Amino acid sequence: LSIRRQRQMCIRDRVGNPAFEVTKGSITFYGKNLLELSPEDRSHEGIFLSFQYPVEIPGVSMVNFMRAAVNEQRKYKGLPALTASEFLKLMREKRAVVELDNKLANRSVNEGFSGGEKKRNEIFQMAMLEPRLSILDETDSGLDIDALRIVAEGVNKLKTPDTSCIVITHYQRLLDYIKPDIVHVLYKGRIVKTAGPELALELEEKGYDWIKKELGE
């Protein structure tokens, strides 16, 4: 998606950032208006956002953080909380998806993690929460080729017929690993071009100026 400020507003509106006010319109997700829900309830409804620059949370262990998140989600859905043994079993299964080292899983959230480890940790969180819609904001930013491959493979393993993923990137290299079904180009706050995966290759080769010319700019 080729957009900067508007892109951030679009994403933050969906996850409920209080710094942004929606003055008109609605965001409907599975029949519910997200604008009427708190950020945590939007998450419980199945929306996940990965950050371009994941933050560190000193003093909060990954185990406690994820157990609280998973059980709050289950409570919202009317399901019983996972026992300690059930949760640890689930955590082991999901760690394997992104090859997350057990030592990292037992440390404070993102504290002292490398850039690649932070991104891998976010895909691990995505695996634990099993969202219906994941928004990955420049997940490839700052990753070396090995970390990029592992993160992309994790995303691919989590793909199901019942889930969707919006991948925001400025580079073709991520799409060498994650094959998109549809590519959208946003310009000045609106979608101006939609096509299949071949559009990403064309953008990599030509840039974006040809789209502006098509728009008469």
State the predicted function of each range.
Residues 45, 55-132:
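ABC-family P-loop ATPase nucleotide-binding domains
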Residues 148-161:
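Helical segment within the ABC ATPase nucleotide-binding domain
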